[in-house]
Structure formats: structure tokens, C-alpha cells
Amino acid sequence: MRRSLAPSQRLGVRIKSKDAFTPPLQKKNKRVCQEELQKRQSALRDATNRVELPLPIRFTANSEYEQAIAKVLARKFKVPIANYVPDYGGNRTLGVRRTIVRRALHDPQACNALVLYVPPAYTEHERMSMDPSKVQVHVVVDPILSNVLRPHQREGVRFMYECVEGKRGNFNGCIMADEMGLGKTLQCVTLTWTLLRQSPDCKPTISKAIIVSPSSLVKNWEKEFTKWLHGRMHCLAMEGGSKEDTTRALEQFAMNTATRCGTPVLLISYETFRLYAHILCKTEVGMVICDEGHRLKNSDNLTYQALMGLKTKRRVLLSGTPIQNDLTEYFSLVNFVNPEMLGTAADFKRNFENSILRGQNADSTDAERQRALQKTQELIGLVNQCIIRRTNQILTKYLPVKFEMVVCVKLTPVQLQIYTNFLKSDQVRRSLADCNEKASLTALADITTLKKLCNHPDLIYEKIAAKEKGFENSQNVLPPNYKPKDVNPELSGKFMLLDFMLAAIRANSDDKVVLISNYTQTLDLFEQLARKRKYTYVRLDGTMTIKKRSKVVDRFNDPSTDCFLFMLSSKAGGCGLNLIGANRLFMFDPDWNPANDEQAMARVWRDGQKKPCYIYRLVASGSIEEKILQRQTHKKSLSSTIIDNNESSEKHFTRDDLKDLFSFEANVLSDTHNKLKCKRCFQDVQRQPPAENTDCTSHLSQWFHCSNNRGLPDSILSQAWTASKCVSFVFHHRSQAESKPAAITEDDESEQQQQSPKRTSKNDDNDEDFDPENSAEEQFLGF
């Protein structure tokens, strides 16, 4: 007979947790020590709000007093540095500091580890006898960065680290001269992060770093640090702001001398640095990095002198363009990063420059030429210790194929008449007759006028309307219904071709297009054409603020936006911008300096690009633009050694220069092709293709030559050639065989998905065609 009710039969009675029924067979006797341990753990959880944290000591929390002590010791340790993110993630608790064995911050034996420093191999006896605080450890790049670095980037990081740490010689500076698109920014982010966190002595190598760049790239540097480090470090980006705010921020940065800073990296433009150099030069800085460092080729300008006053021995100079083959500029760049490597300017002139230049003279003796060669090799041997350069052919493994085309476009009858009338005028005759410095400046203005005319007559309409010298009768050449503010593509051969090609691209693909010109007036015409054809567009020139530039670029690169055209001034944004949202680029007019055009044309074929790229360089057939192209080709074909043997040191044009520049070949398909004296072509028709080992970096003579639209790699250009009837000749080549990108490994593809993303003037925001102070543009070469 049942004497008691089962728990489920006891209606209305709720069993409390302490009275919970336990079957006799399942009941276990707990040991006293286990009960005591559970009480301690329960008390600790209650005291710490159920946050279980490791404790540095053991204690019994069975009273209010000991619970209070437990709460103190279990409290998280807060780093007493504003904005500082510790390496361990901030999960440590308070307690007595424990003695630990020194070890590297990251595992040097881990997969894909990039080890920058290997300590001496100590024996056990040496370790026992050594002071533990003096044992050196490995310097290993943070895995978050080393896992995304490509082989050439790993090599670059190691090279820069060895240079700034004095491992490669008695110097602490270097020049990173990689071509555009090879990830110089990522390499510098890696170097900076490593030096700020590690050293062989288990402490930061540097406490602060300054990165100086063109104003348009300050925000880009901040984005790159955030992107690759995922918010682990805060940067002070100086863009905009009042003078008072800027002064206060820079003074706080300069006065912070702690080993670990909450904001250890200052991002600042060249112009701002020059204005506030008196603040930044007061205290020592661990390292300075100068982006677009070719701006420092003139040691006499104020920016160069201000940066030289910075108290730091670690100097890194970045330049995506080849170092100009001029000894004075070469000395300035090397002297900036390593002031004692080549001695003073007088020492350099005596030891190298005089001998090398003497050997270049036409009347030099064999002994002088031999000595010049010896000095050249000696100089190369010295500077190669601190310079690393790789070409963008490395990118062919990671990026889609790039097709580059030089399109020779015929002038329209209106352009042709105005052009020839100007060449026959007294204005040009006087320039040819008198070649002094004043006449050369006048010739520069005339050359700029002709370049603008090749773009569109609208660009020189004010001169025509005012009947300036050389344009007295040009008003009669314009059509009767001509309106200067209403763009008419039919008056310009290049605009006709552009109009046809944009229409074909818009109708047949979803490609986006970048339009680049040296003149804001040409950008104005681009805008008028875009509004006329109902194309969506954005524009970036020297008038746009830095903050707005970043928003415009992000908007254009967003694949979800229907922004068809990006109009860019090469002087204001030709360097550093990442425009991978587009895969077609028009270089509407050439620059005297080939490096400037190379910088501008590198905006789309960069890391993160997924589509084949098409680069179109438009030049007016037989005109001054072809003369400029010929000089570019000659400069690019020169051996990249110390000095350009044919470079003129004069600061003005010679009479032969002007005669060539002011000549015009009216009835040729391409004056450039004629001067190449191509042996692969017969009567302007290619009979033999270029060698298989050539690509778009080869000389123009090794490109494909087309006098008709057959064989073109781009169907859009082929259609426009037939429709516009204004193309006369095309040079074209590609970056690599189209099958190469398919050979990318899965690791490379994964790495490429993680990664995404240079004007030589003194002020990148100065949107004009010619800078008289830029000697690279004043010196011209024969073809």
C-alpha cells in the first residue's frame, strides 16, 4: 500500500530547488572539498557579475570582505593611454606582474610567418648566464598582414626594415621606387605597424611616425591603415580644419614622448607640413615616410628644407615613377633619405658629376669616357644599397589583361586651318628667329595654345575672338552658327572619336570610363558632352576639397551606382587615386613628362580590378602632340641608369627644337610611325607581328601597328574607327597573354579578394599645363 504521493500527484504543491526529488539510486554523496569549491566559485561569480576571469591568486570568498577583494582583483585592466589598443586585446586582469620568459610577439614558426630579424642562437649555458632583460627575440610581422602580403611585398617589407634598422650598411633610409599598383602603401603600413610594436629587445622600435603625402592622398592613407589593421591603431589625419585646431593637434602630437602613444601616426600633406614644420621639428620622431617622393627632387624648395629639419634618422621615400635621369635630382633624393651617403653637394659634384658629364661630351677622349663609365658604375653600386624597384609586370599574375592603344586622330578641317595659319604667323617666326630665354617662354605659351587647339577650338576661342597674334583671321574659319558654350564634337577629331566610343560603350556594355586631361577647360567640354548625351558623371579637379574627393571616388567605384564617367584633372588627381570601378580610360592629351602620363593611366589597372582594361591615348596626327609622344618614347627607351646621355641641361629651347615642334605633317597617317622607320611594315601595313616576348612596356617600335581597323583588340575602337572616319593610325599592345590570369592559384585569388586598393609638380592641386620651375618639362630630347 502506497504511503506517500509521487511528486506529480501532489497537486498545488510546487517543489523548490532545495527540495528537489532525487531518486535514491542516483543520489551521490559530495565530498566536503567539492562543496567548498562550489561555494567559492558561486561566491566569485556573484561578486564579479557572473564574468569569469582568470585570477592571479587564490582566495576564499566566503565573507563580504573577501568578496570585495575578489571584485577588485577580477576587474579588467584598463590601459592608461588614450586610444591605445593593447596587443592582448584588453582581457587581462589586475594583479602582481609575473616574471615571464622573453618571447617574440608572434610565432616565427607559424605558417606564412614573415621574420624580419632572427636573434643570435644562444646555448643553454649562455641563456642561464645572461641577464633575462637582454635576451633578444625574433621580429615577426603581424599575421594579419603577413597572410595578405604577396611575395614581392614581403621582399619589399624586409628590404625597408633592413634599411631603416641599419642592417644593410651605415645608413637608415631607403627609396621604394616600385611602379604604380604594386602595393607600396600596404608595405609601408606593415613596416610602420611592426616598428611601432616590436623590436629585438621586446619593446617598440619607434613610438611615433609621420607620413607626408599629397593632400589628395591623406584620407586614402587613413583608410589603408583602418583597412589592413582593422582598427587596431588610431591615426591623426590632418585634413582641413582651422588653424587653431591644427596647431593644437600637432602640438599634442609633438609633445607626446611616451613609448606607446594612443595616436602614433600623423598623416599630413606636404603643404601643411611646410606651414607647421616649426612645431613638428621640435621633438624627435621615429620615422618619416614621404609618399610621391619625387616632389623632393629639388633640394632648394621650402618643403624639402622643412622635411630635412625633422629630427629622425629613419627616412623612407616612395615614388611610383622612375627616378629622373638627372644627376642633381638624383643626388637630392638620395641625400634626403641618407644625407651622408654621397657627401655634400660639392663632394658629389667633384667625385661623380664632373667626371660623368665630361664623359658625355661629344669631344670627350677615350680616357674621359672610360672614367665616366667607372664613376657611373661606382655611383650605381652606392645608391643601389638603399633603392628597390620592381615593375608592374609583377601584376600580370594577379590582374586581368590590359590593352594599351595609342590612337592617332586626324584634325578636322577647322582645326587644320587654324593650326596651319598660326604656324605661318609672325608670332611663330619671331620665336624661331630669337631663341633667348624670353623668347622660349613665349614659345611655351604658343606650344600650350597648339595643344589646346588639338583638343578643341573652344579652348582657344578667347584668343580667336580677341584676334591675338596668330589668330587674326581665325574667326572666319569657324562655322557661322558657332557657339562657344555649346559643345560641338564635330569641330574636333578627338571629340568626335570620343563621342562615338562613349556611345558604343554605353550601348553595348556596363563598363565605366575615366576621362583624363591636363586642362580643366577640356573637363568643362566633357561635362557639356555628358549632359548633352544624358550620361551620369562625376568630376575631380583642383577645386574639389579633400573630403569631397574621397566621397566622389567611393561613389564611382561602387558597382551599384550608375555613374558612367569619371572626369579627372591629371594635375590634381593623377597620382594615388584608385578607380577600379572603371576598366576603360581615355588619356585625352599627352604631357611632356612621360612619368605623369604613366601615373594618370595607372588609375584603373590596379589591385582589385576584375575586368579587362582598355587604355586609349589620343594624339592629333602630325601635330605637336605627336612630337611630345616621340619625346616621351625616347625618354622611356633610355637605359634606367644614373644619367640620360642625351638630356639637355639648357633651360630653354634650341632653334632645332622649335623648328621641330612648330612643324606640321598634314598628310601622314602617323608622324611617329614614319620616324620609327619600322622594318615590320610596308607602306604603313604591318607584315610581321612583334616578338612574342614584347608587351605594352616595350618600345613603340615593338607594338602592333594598324593603318586600318583590322586586328584591333577592341571592338569598340574598331566600330568607332569606321563610324567617325577620323582615326588614321593605331599602335597597340597588351600587358600579358590573355590566358595568364586563368592560371592564378586559389591562394592568389583569395589574396586578391582581400586586397584592393605620380605627378612631379610642386603642387598637385595646381591645374595648369606647364610649371616653369619643373626642369623635367623644360628639357626636351630628339626622337
Curated annotation (Swiss-Prot):
One annotated Gene Ontology cellular component of this protein: nucleus
Any matching Pfam family: Helicase_C
Entries under PROSITE patterns matching the protein: HELICASE_ATP_BIND_1, HELICASE_CTER
Residue ranges annotated for the Helicase ATP-binding domain, each copy included: 165-340
Domain annotation Helicase C-terminal: ranges: 497-654
Ranges of compositional bias, category Acidic residues: 765-776
Assembly behavior: Interacts (via N-terminus) with spn-A/Rad51.
Similarity field: Belongs to the SNF2/RAD54 helicase family.
This protein's name: DNA repair and recombination protein RAD54-like
Lineage of the species this protein comes from: Eukaryota, Metazoa, Ecdysozoa, Arthropoda, Hexapoda
